[in-house]
Structure formats: C-alpha cells, structure tokens
Amino acid sequence: QEGVPNPLKPGVQRIPISSEDSQNIWDYLEHKTFLTRVASRIQPIRHPQHKRYAHIDLATQSLAGVSICHLAGSQLVEGLVKDGEPFAEYRLVVEYDFILTICAGQNKPINLGKIQKFFFWLRDMCGYQFGLITADMWQSEMPLQELEARNFEVDKLSIDRDKSVY
C-alpha cells in the first residue's frame, strides 16, 4: 500500500481535542485501519512486533501534529554514481502508521494531556511498543516528563529549526 494510511473516520480532517468535551483522539479514528485482533490481543496490523517511533509537534492554539512510524525492513537500492560506476546498497524502509493533525476546540485550546493519553492507549490497549517519542521544544517539557514517568523513552527534537532531520 502506497502512502501514509489515513485512520480518520469519514468526514474528519482534523481532530479537535480540548477540554470542552470528553472526546479523545481514538474516538475520531477507524480502528480497523491500523489495528487487528489476534486471539484475544489487539495489535497493530503492520509489523506488530516492530518498535514504533513518534514525534509530537505541539501547539495549543493552532495545529499540533502526531506522527508514528516503524522500520519495516530494508531494501536493496541499485544505480549508477556520477561517473557511471554501479553501486548497490541496502537502505532502511520506514513505514508510517499514521500522521494526525490536531486542532483546538471551538472555545478551548488543544488539551496536551489528551495527546499523552493517546500514547498510553496505543501502548496499553493496542499493543504498540515504542522505541522513542520525541517532541519539539515548544511546551514539551511537561508532556515528555509525564510520558517518561510512565516508562516511555523520550527526547526533544526540534525539526523546525534543524533541517538536518529532513
């Protein structure tokens, strides 16, 4: 399957997450697009045994983003270098589970605690195993501390200012 899977329910483009209501991120998702049941266990459809890596781009008034990916394997890449010499090398294949856009509610800002709860839900209810969760520098100290306190590996990574991550 090409492209990043879209797990949003029909008609949803952005996920409004605030303290205005009791809705959580998972309430806006079609679970069958990224989860499956094996025996009595819920797990990711794609490569359930692989660790996931996530980045959170935080905001409270504008748009926040959550992306989750995993290493799907490696692939042989063959070609020619500038002078016509052939080359072949294996490169890692990264597969995105999803990329979500989160917006504020009508009257209240984005609830960062509900973003944290989403990671707890993915791990505790859906069988996701996380290798690392990163967040940009803006307002990330408290959410990352909370995730770390709940046994997630976390770090800060500002991709807006450091183009080397691209």
Provide a role label for each language-model segment.
Residues 1-159:
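RNase H-like, metal-dependent nuclease domains and their acidic two-metal-ion catalytic environment used
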Residues 158-166:
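Core RecA-like ATPase module of SF1/SF2 helicases and allied nucleic-acid translocases
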